[in-house]
């Protein structure tokens, strides 16, 4: 088994999908949580000067959260059984990532840096919030219909197999649902899916024991 180190801030953010995949697979890894005060000094050491970054065997470095997530999903068996399955898992995951990305961008400063503060006002929060809301209006009905296509939406996006797509549904909507608990009231299948992920035998212990952070 390779050794893994996941580098990210002490927040869920764009790395949580990767942490959830490790938890679902039961694979040990070094969860390196970088303090924001450390970041300036180490930024240029990171590929693309960004995190998250996955380090494998202290030799290989993979940047970009969804590239990391896809790699782990393939390695651990959470990316579908064939190429068509993988394409379905990918487009579902990317749809939820669009929601996550637009949400987090409401808390970026003018230089594009994540502020990790709910009270932060970047001066264009209204415009960015409208974009986030439009993304949700565009994507959530489609995701509800997509889920219903397999077993009436009563299991997972791929039927009886939990994949990265289901984990993305959970983690991408965590903060938005904190802001608006009725967000999924028109999407009961998605709400039930998130409950299934939360009660999964591998996910439940992880979700209960992980660090509590704002983002």
From Swiss-Prot:
BP-aspect Gene Ontology terms: glutathione metabolic process
GO molecular function: glutathione transferase activity; structural constituent of eye lens
Domain (GST N-terminal) ranges: 2-80
Tissue: Lens.
InterPro entries: Glutathione-S-Trfase_C-like (IPR010987), Glutathione-S-Trfase_C_sf (IPR036282), Glutathione_S-Trfase_N (IPR004045), GST_C (IPR004046), GST_superfamily (IPR050213), S-crystallin (IPR003083), Thioredoxin-like_sf (IPR036249)
Keyword Disulfide bond attributed: no
Keywords: Eye lens protein
Domain GST C-terminal stretches: 82-215
Superkingdom of source: Eukaryota
Family: Belongs to the GST superfamily.
Function: S-crystallins are structural components of squids and octopi eye lens. Contains relatively little GST activity (1/1000 of that of mammalian GST enzyme).
Protein known as: S-crystallin 2
Organism field: Octopus vulgaris
């Amino acid at each position: 088994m390779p050794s893994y180190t996941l580098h990210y801030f002490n927040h869920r953010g764009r790395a949580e999908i990767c942490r959830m995949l490790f938890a679902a697979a039961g694979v040990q890894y070094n969860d390196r949580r970088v303090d924001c005060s450390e970041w300036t000094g180490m930024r240029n050491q990171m590929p693309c000067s960004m995190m998250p970054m996955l380090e494998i065997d202290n030799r290989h470095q993979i940047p970009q959260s969804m590239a990391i997530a896809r790699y782990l999903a393939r390695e651990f068996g959470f990316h579908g059984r064939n190429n068509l399955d993988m394409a379905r898992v990918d487009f579902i995951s990317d749809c939820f990532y669009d929601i996550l990305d637009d949400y987090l961008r409401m808390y970026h400063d003018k230089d594009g840096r994540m502020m990790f503060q709910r009270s932060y006002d970047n001066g264009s929060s209204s415009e960015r919030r409208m974009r986030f809301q439009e993304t949700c209006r565009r994507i959530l009905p489609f995701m509800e219909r997509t889920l219903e296509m397999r077993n009436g939406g009563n299991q997972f996006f791929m039927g009886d197999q939990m994949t990265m797509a289901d984990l993305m549904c959970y983690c991408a909507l965590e903060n938005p649902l904190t802001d608006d608990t009725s967000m999924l009231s028109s999407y009961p299948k998605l709400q039930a899916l998130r409950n299934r992920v939360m009660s999964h035998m591998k996910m439940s212990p992880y979700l209960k024991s992980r660090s509590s952070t704002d983002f």
